[in-house]
């Protein structure tokens, strides 16, 4: 019976130790979301993937380290439309 209590205590300590980093990550994510302005119709898209898995020339003309955004209603001057984004049940222009 003592062994069961000790194992349960160790399990609870381990679960609590894992929960604290999760809470810290949740707090960081909440703080990051609060910093995003809601009145701006611009959405920043950040993508990361393994370069070896990406199809070559999947988007002609798109270069590495190019800043791309989903915009409504159209791209800004100097940007080119490369496709479409679907966000918040709306269609946005994918501009780089």
From Swiss-Prot:
One of its GO terms (cellular component) is extracellular space. Residues 1-19 form the signal peptide. The keyword Disulfide bond applies. It comes from the Eukaryota. Keywords: Antibiotic, Antimicrobial, Defensin, Disulfide bond, Fungicide, Secreted, Signal. SMART domains: Defensin_propep, DEFSN. Pfam families: Defensin_1 (PF00323), Defensin_propep (PF00879). Its main location: secreted. The keyword Metal-binding does not apply. It is found in: Secreted. Disulfide bonds join 68-96, 70-85, 75-95. GO terms for biological process: antibacterial humoral response; antimicrobial humoral immune response mediated by antimicrobial peptide; cellular response to lipopolysaccharide; defense response to fungus; defense response to Gram-negative bacterium; defense response to Gram-positive bacterium; disruption of plasma membrane integrity in another organism; innate immune response in mucosa. Residues 20-66 form a propeptide. Probable antibiotic and antifungal activity. Belongs to the alpha-defensin family. This is Neutrophil defensin 8. It comes from Macaca mulatta.
């Amino acid at each position: 019976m003592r062994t069961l209590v000790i194992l349960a205590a160790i399990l609870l300590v381990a679960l609590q130790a894992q929960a604290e980093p999760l809470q810290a990550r949740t707090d960081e994510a909440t703080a990051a979301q609060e910093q995003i302005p809601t009145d701006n119709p611009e959405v920043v898209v950040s993508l990361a993937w393994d370069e070896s898995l990406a199809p070559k020339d999947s988007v002609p003309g798109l270069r590495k380290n190019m800043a791309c955004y989903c915009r409504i209603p159209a791209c800004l001057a100097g940007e080119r439309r490369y496709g479409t984004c679907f966000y918040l049940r709306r269609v946005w222009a994918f501009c780089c």
